[in-house]
């Protein structure tokens, strides 16, 4: 069973819903969830927020934070996760933001520097990844790590 299938199974078992907010993964997280038969029982939907304006308007990410630090930081990942969870009224959410490569971004973040976040009603956990593969492999690894984070967070009391 792959990471997405395991995550969907855990969500079903716990009767929880999921929403996603994606930047660097560009919808891959949502695609992997919806590849799982029966995922409609738990997956509400997602926001692909590549542009700062979308992060601000749809997810409630602080504009000043984006201007000062750029989108590749723990605080933005956390705000994305909390924002999509609230906006879609989900029990739990996942968010991804970072630089998948191949070049650096406007704030010169390293290629492979990606932040993933998982928000529940009671907390939001952010994890930094430092990946070193191709763009596609970095995006896939970020998704796998996000699903693993979700599983860990749902095991916590």
Predicted regions and their residues:
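Short alpha-helical segments enriched in small residues
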Residues: 1-157
